[in-house]
């Protein structure tokens, strides 16, 4: 993902926001905020707002997402923003958007299921919420979806 590109996603695009995070994008969300409030925050933080809110479709720094279907939304946003979905995948937490940091295997012994600990050597921890990630948590599924939509 382009390190300078920062995104805000409205509450209608929460699933898309999580997936963009898994692809490495810096995406903030807050389902409690209206589209107009999120747009104001996005402008202060230098972010592009992605939205399905028709009232915001002509505003500057807004990408109106046409499709209702998730896979079409993902393709549309990746193409329109010129994102490379394979450049920095799995570097952000899908839940809270913080960066993932490699963590020593022995530090996650009691934090992952025993079969996961026994079958994996590399782990990452979210710097924000502490969630633990490991290879094959999402990569195979995400790659399959990217392939299925031609990305």
Segments the model singles out, each with a brief description of its role:
Residues 93-96, 126-129:
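Short cysteine-rich clusters marking metal-coordination/redox-active sites
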Residues 142, 146-151:
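Short, intrinsically disordered terminal segments enriched in charged and Pro/Gly residues
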Residues 98-102, 134:
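Short functional micro-motifs and their immediate structural scaffolds
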Residues 87-91, 118-121:
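Flanking scaffold residues of small Cys/His-coordinated metal-binding clusters
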Residues 110-123:
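Short linker/helix segments within small regulatory modules
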